[in-house]
Amino acid sequence: MAEMSKTEIARFIRQGTFTGKLATVKKDGGSHVVPIWFVLDNENSKGRSRIGNIVFTTYSVSAKAKNIGRNNRVSICIDDQIPPFSFVTIFGTAEIHTYKQKEVLKWAKRIAKRYMGKDEAEAYGKRNSGEGEVLVKIRPIKIIAEKDIASWD
């Protein structure tokens, strides 16, 4: 088992269709964990080794949106399912953006393209950007990343 470099973290998070397991804080202080589809917003990051913000869409009155509205501290874990196994856990703050539908659609299509492919991106993008959908951006504060957890080396 070894720590990932910043470049390895960025590459790992961008690859394939790994879902993120998002943890938010419930009203009673307990945790709420759900899988999410996401992409990275690299507009304000410098270089390929920087991951930028994590972006996803959700319904404005979903449990995760309500939780973020009360307490914006979140964590997200992205892991693979193939030995020797690796993971990235990001601790950060989330911000809900109530953009116009056109902006939410732009991001929803990017997310859908990653998980459903180019042919389905438009349909899934529209489905996940309708009335009441919002954009959430997570700004990373701390990252823990390990690779080859089950390796004998």
Question: Model-derived features: where do they sit?
Answer:
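AMP-binding (ANL) adenylation modules
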Residues: 81-83
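Extreme N-terminal tail/first-helix region
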Residues: 1-16
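Generic structural signal for secondary-structure transition and capping sites
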Residues: 18, 73-74, 116, 143
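Short beta-strand segments
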Residues: 17-60, 68, 74-78, 88-89
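Alpha-helix boundary recognition
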Residues: 13-14, 69-70, 129
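Short, solvent-exposed aromatic-acidic interface loops
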Residues: 58-63, 115
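Charged, gly/pro-rich active-site loop segments
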Residues: 4, 86-153
